[in-house]
Amino acid sequence: MSAVPIHAATSSDAIRLELEEVLKLQRAAYFAHPYPTFAERKADLLKLKAFIKDNRDAIVDAISADYGNRSRHETLFAEIFSVVDGVEHTLKHLKTWMKPQRRGVDIKNFFGAKNRVAPPPLGIVGAIVPWNFPINLSFSGLIAAFAAGNRSMVKMSENSRHLAKLL
């Protein structure tokens, strides 16, 4: 997946216009390449994992600033470690999840036929993230969206402004 530029808007109209522009870019990117391969999905998930690991301390500090003062250990256990584990679990099962699934066929009407279903990516997935556990709730959705081959747009809570600025 190609990177889509990220900008921070300030007013409501500016935010709406920016989101519409990002959605337009996401749609164009999706229609240009609607079926990411296993390697592309794996690369996206590894980038997500690397981002979390490389920016762990900055994320913890931003969340603490948003909460007023949140325990570093709580953030590490409830947010960082669970997301990293989620990526690792998804990577472990991704190839199996991408395989076409067998479905039954009416033997009377279609004798000898075989049926398979390969769920396609849906396109762009939107996530509106609440203020509590913002990394866990946003990145868990991103993990699932990327594993399914989708693109994603995330709208962080206004109460998570330090973290939103970091992301």
Predicted regions and their residues:
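Rossmann-like NAD(P) dinucleotide-binding subdomain of oxidoreductase/dehydrogenase enzymes
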Residues: D106-L167
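N-terminal Rossmann-like NAD(P)+-binding subdomain of aldehyde/semialdehyde dehydrogenases
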Residues: M1-N115
